[in-house]
């Protein structure tokens, strides 16, 4: 028997890589689902900044479309989020995003299925579905690939949003 105190090993303080990446994946996906695009697009950029590595690579189903680096991916994300935010906040677009985990068995790799429903004020709906594969390094995404993309419904048009002319205010007269 030893008189030296026993301390937990570092392995007890930090879960195994499989658990660590699964926990990070759940946190990232919950943050995405809970964010509200009609309120702010900046919330999504904050999530991206928190969870993605500086050297992240994002791709679609074809390898030629790989986008390297956080700055380039952030710009692409911004070009998607700003118009979506304007359509939701000003145009009355209803936006709902859902995620379902897909079981995996490799440490540092996660899979999920996504659904984005866009509903215009006209009632017209466009649904986008895709799957995501992520590689993690600790709590940071270092690679993300989107695949199995599907679109249901037709793209929404200007007529499906409420950007129409504003009714004149009663009692307000234009200057002559």
PLM feature spans:
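C-terminal and inter-domain tail/linker signature
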Residues: 2-176
């Amino acid at each position: 028997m030893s008189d030296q105190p026993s301390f937990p090993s570092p392995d007890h303080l930090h879960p195994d890589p499989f658990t660590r990446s699964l926990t990070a994946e759940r946190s990232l996906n919950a943050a995405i689902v809970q964010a509200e695009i009609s309120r702010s697009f900046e919330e999504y950029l904050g999530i991206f900044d928190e969870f993605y590595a500086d050297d992240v690579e994002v791709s679609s189903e074809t390898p030629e479309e790989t986008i390297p680096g956080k700055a380039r991916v952030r710009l692409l994300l911004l070009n998607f989020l700003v118009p979506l935010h304007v359509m939701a906040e000003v145009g009355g677009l209803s936006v709902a995003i859902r995620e379902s985990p897909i079981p995996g068995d490799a440490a540092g790799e996660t899979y999920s299925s996504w659904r984005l429903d866009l509903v215009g004020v006209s009632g017209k709906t466009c649904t986008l579905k895709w799957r995501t594969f992520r590689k993690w390094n600790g709590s940071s995404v270092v690679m993300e690939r989107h695949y199995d993309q599907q679109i249901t419904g037709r793209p929404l048009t200007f007529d499906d949003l409420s950007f129409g002319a504003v009714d004149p205010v009663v009692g307000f007269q234009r200057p002559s």
